[in-house]
Each structure stands twice: as structure tokens, then as C-alpha cells.
Amino acid sequence: MRMIRRAWQQLDHAMIRFMRANGIRALRVALGIVFVWFGALKVAGLSPVGDLVAGTVYWIDPRVFVPLLGIWEIAVGLGLLSGVAMRMVLLFFWLQMAGTFLVLVLRPELAFQRGNPLLLTTTGEFVIKNLVLIAAGLVIGSAIRPGAAERSDETRSGHA
């Protein structure tokens, strides 16, 4: 029994070391891939949320706004993937994330069933899931050390 407990503790410690060494980098890369992918779909005019974006930000021509939003998202994604200028990247990330919630304010009929904020539509679920992306941004941002150079070895390794 003692051997099993010791083996379990060693495995547990190894797993924790692995997650500490790679978790933030993996989160940054995964978030970067999502942003590049979603942005590329908008630029190509193939995004399934293009109409939603156009209908939410109705005061700007969607032929201009949707591709520009896509370029913005690609830039955020590339920044996350590279780990360069993370403070600026995260600023753009936060601005984009704030924009995703506009539909809840400007077009609530698209997000909520029968006007009830507890009853989400598919669109509402799509928007609310961005809370997970926000949490990911918080974790990535929490790893940036105050005053650290933007492109240090720590930033590239995911521990900045």
C-alpha cells in the first residue's frame, strides 16, 4: 500500500509540474488559434456569425466592419501565438471581448428566449461562452510580470 501511495504521489507531482510548465503557454496558443481561425472566417466572408455581427453593429457597413473585425481578431490571435507585446495584445483582446457582449444589450431578442435572461437562445449561448475566453485572458494576463520586457524568455515559454 505504501508503494502505491508513493507511486501515486510521484505521478501527481509530475503531472502538476507538467501543467505548471505548460499550462499557460497551451492556453495562450489555444486562444490564439481560436482568434486566428474565427478572424479568418470573417475576413473570407464565411463566418457563421457574420450576420449577427452585422445586425448588432448595424450603424457600420458590414462589408467593411465584419472583415475589419476579422483582421482585428487575426492580429490578436497572432499576438497570442507569438507571445510578443502581450500587454498590447491583451488590450485588444479585452476590447474585442467587450464588443461580443453588445448583442445582449443592443439585440437582447436574439440572445434570450421570451425576453428571459435565464433562457438563452443559441446566439445567447454563443455569447455567454465568451466568459470562458475572458477567464483564459485573465489567466494569461496574470502571468505577465510587472515591468518585464515584452519579449523575454519567460514570455515565450508562457510564464511571462
Where are these regions (language model features)?
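Membrane-interface extramembranous regions
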Residues: 1-160
